[in-house]
Amino acid sequence: MKLMTKQIEKAARKQYNLGSDLDQNVVAKFFDPCGSWSWFVMNQDPDNPEYLWGIIKGFEVEQGSFSLSELQNYRGRLGLGIERDISFRPQPARGILHMLLEGKHV
């Protein structure tokens, strides 16, 4: 499965100038189907599309950058890679962060 579609790239690059500001949308959700990690994409640098910025739910919930190629190349248990949640629709980043910090599923 392709993680970044043209539509997601366009939306993420459009928000690049917002940086880590939570007053923007999360435009995509990636997840490990064999684990509990999730990555919520907020923006992407148009000049360096390798790196994405967003919210990461791993051992803890945090904001930060993550590598698109690392996500694309990762193979976990059972040989499965990171997937994109195809039912996810853009949502305000602030709301997603608060839900995750409260232990809710997004």
What are these regions (language model features)?
Residues 1-106:
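Catalytic phosphate/metal-binding cores of nucleic-acid and nucleotide-processing enzymes, i.e., regions
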